[in-house]
């Protein structure tokens, strides 16, 4: 069936991304259209931003654009730490974000794309962690020519990101430390020139 050819998002998973905290949250699309609805602040833009992060280089991303927000309102750091409100210091008057997670946690966003016309599956993922208390998170990029999931493939590695990398390589995944080789990898698989 030619209507099913081409890669389509089959499943989106997020772990410790924005306010999606402490467990794997899954959006199962199976290559079909989906509709994100909900109240203001319910996470619609957060999920769109996860997909954008998987596919677009960091220097081209404007987070929370779907909600029409100020470009400084959300950052990769705010998503990884789970900033959900600001508290004002009564002495200085300065606002400080309040986080769901401490800097010792890690975050994963994962998309499984399937081309039913050719029976091909590709998983793209990014893993984030804080190397220091300031600045943006560290990350690595993953591509695999099969379906992976956060619960089974990105867990049970202790707290050492190097062990997670080793585990994922053992599953046949390609790991990259920057966006350009990762993008080249997925563009080849998706047939994007």
Listing of model-derived features with the role each one plays in the protein:
Residues 1-193:
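Extreme N-terminal "head/tail" segments of very large remodeling/mechanoenzyme assemblies
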